[in-house]
Curated annotation (Swiss-Prot):
Family: Belongs to the ATPase delta chain family.
Cited function: F(1)F(0) ATP synthase produces ATP from ADP in the presence of a proton or sodium gradient. F-type ATPases consist of two structural domains, F(1) containing the extramembraneous catalytic core and F(0) containing the membrane proton channel, linked together by a central stalk and a peripheral stalk. During catalysis, ATP synthesis in the catalytic domain of F(1) is coupled via a rotary mechanism of the central stalk subunits to proton translocation.
Cross-referenced InterPro entries: ATP_synth_OSCP/delta_N_sf, ATPase_OSCP/d_CS, ATPase_OSCP/dsu
The protein's assembly and partners: F-type ATPases have 2 components, F(1) - the catalytic core - and F(0) - the membrane proton channel. F(1) has five subunits: alpha(3), beta(3), gamma(1), delta(1), epsilon(1). F(0) has three main subunits: a(1), b(2) and c(10-14). The alpha and beta chains form an alternating ring which encloses part of the gamma chain. F(1) is attached to F(0) by a central stalk formed by the gamma and epsilon chains, while a peripheral stalk is formed by the delta and b chains.
Keywords: ATP synthesis, Cell membrane, CF(1), Hydrogen ion transport, Ion transport, Membrane, Transport
Coiled coil: none
Matching Pfam families: OSCP
Record-level Gene Ontology MF annotations: proton-transporting ATP synthase activity, rotational mechanism
SUPFAM superfamilies: N-terminal domain of the delta subunit of the F1F0-ATP synthase (SSF47928)
Biological classification of the source: Bacteria, Bacillati, Bacillota, Clostridia, Peptostreptococcales
Name used for this protein in its record: ATP synthase subunit delta
Length: 181
């Protein structure tokens, strides 16, 4: 579950995006910032979180690093997070913002776990079937997990559709155990 604080900041940024008709653009920029801080430049993220660095220095760093990378809205948003000591919530804010954007665009994200990588055709076919079932636009990310042996396990929200060989074998094993004992 996403943090209440992160939700509030995400809602504020989303509202700004709605007012300026730029919710998608703001999300792409927010995603870019989070990727940069969590994957590319972890040290920069540590500096922004550090209590040893003054807030004015942190805001100057944000201005310098992101001067050409993102809009002033995202830079100012980051500066507010720095001012309020909320920069550590950035990843949760991104997740909360994505949920708001998905809700606006009638999208549900799902995961299809399979033993081998699914083809693009299979993923698209699964997305179409699930979109029809849920009356929403379903986007699927394929994750490979060799422990499921075969088949597909689909997770969408709190729902799980289990079509894996492992589960079928486990059920057979259970039934055999009942018969034998």
């Amino acid at each position: 579950m996403i943090n209440v604080i992160a939700n509030r900041y995400a809602e504020a940024l989303f509202q700004l995006g709605e007012e300026e008709n730029s919710t998608d653009v703001l999300f792409k920029e927010l995603e870019k910032v989070v990727d940069m801080m969590t994957k590319v430049s972890k040290d920069f993220y540590k500096v922004l979180k550090s209590p040893l660095v003054s807030k004015s220095e942190k805001k100057n760093l944000v201005e310098i690093i992101f001067s050409k990378e993102v809009s002033s809205n995202i830079k100012n948003f980051l500066k507010v997070l720095v001012d309020k000591d909320r920069i550590s919530y950035l990843e949760d804010i991104e997740l909360a913002y994505k949920e708001l954007l998905n809700k606006k665009n009638n999208v549900i994200d799902g995961v299809a776990i399979s033993a081998i990588p699914m083809s693009e055709t299979d993923i698209k076919e699964l997305e179409v079937k699930l979109s029809n079932k849920y009356n929403k636009n379903v986007t699927i990310e394929n994750v490979v997990d060799k422990t499921i042996l075969g088949g597909v396990l689909v997770r969408i929200g709190n729902e799980q559709i289990d079509g894996t060989v492992k589960t079928r074998l486990d059920k057979m094993k259970e039934k055999l155990s009942e018969v034998i004992s």
